[in-house]
Structure formats: structure tokens, C-alpha cells
């Protein structure tokens, strides 16, 4: 059963501007170290950072909380299977929310171009 759906879109240039202005501090605020390493393993990391930003926003919307006190940036980690399929690992408050809602998984889909990144998240029992 579907418990929630969230979607987000962001301009890659906004993420690039934040990376340029705040550097590592911005990245460490929104991403796990594994996510930073993955994004920066690509020649142009900004679209990959933007996709993870959008994925976390979409996931928080699927929970109905948004990013804030109930669910923070580091409570969600976007990972990839060997096939390339993305998935979300919930930590801390995210894991607690999953248990409180009797949710067993969050499905996500990511897409990005040079200009935009978007994500769709579905919270299921």
C-alpha cells in the first residue's frame, strides 16, 4: 500500500552556485560522505549532487514532513545497486519514522539533465 508520494525538481545551477559559494560545508550539510564521493567521482558532479538533493526533498515530502526537525538531510542516504538503480537508506529519525508509519521501503527514481534534476519518492508498506 502506498503511504505517501513526493516529487522535487531543482535547477542544477542553484546547486552549483551553493557548491561554489559554500564548498565542502554545503556538501557536508546535505550529503553523507559516500554520496559526496559518488558525486565527485564524475567529471561534472553538480547534476549528481542536485539529484540527491531532489531525492531527499522528495522523500521528505512522501513522509509529509519536509526537511526539518522531524527528518534531516543526514537521516536519508541515496545509494545505488550494482545495476545503477537508486534506493534510500534511512538513518536516525528517518528509520524511526519508517517504523512509526509501518513503512518497509521508499522507492525513488532520479533523473537529471545539464539544467535540472528531479526525483520521485514513494513510501510503501
Where do the protein language model's features map onto the residues?
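Core catalytic alpha/beta fold that binds nucleotide/phospho-ligands
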Residues: 1-125
Amino acid at each position: 500500500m502506498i503511504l505517501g508520494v513526493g516529487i522535487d525538481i531543482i535547477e542544477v545551477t542553484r546547486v552549483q552556485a551553493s557548491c561554489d559559494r559554500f564548498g565542502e560545508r554545503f556538501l557536508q550539510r546535505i550529503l553523507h560522505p559516500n554520496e559526496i564521493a559518488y558525486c565527485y567521482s564524475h567529471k561534472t558532479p553538480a547534476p549528481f549532487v542536485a539529484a540527491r538533493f531532489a531525492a531527499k526533498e522528495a522523500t521528505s515530502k512522501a513522509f509529509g514532513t519536509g526537511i526539518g526537525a522531524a527528518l534531516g538531510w543526514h537521516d536519508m542516504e541515496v545509494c545505488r545497486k550494482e545495476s545503477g538503480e537508486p534506493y534510500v537508506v534511512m538513518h536516525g529519525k528517518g528509520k524511526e519514522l519508517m517504523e512509526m508509519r509501518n513503512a518497509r521501503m521508499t522507492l525513488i527514481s532520479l533523473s537529471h539533465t545539464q539544467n535540472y534534476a528531479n526525483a520521485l519518492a514513494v513510501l510503501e508498506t
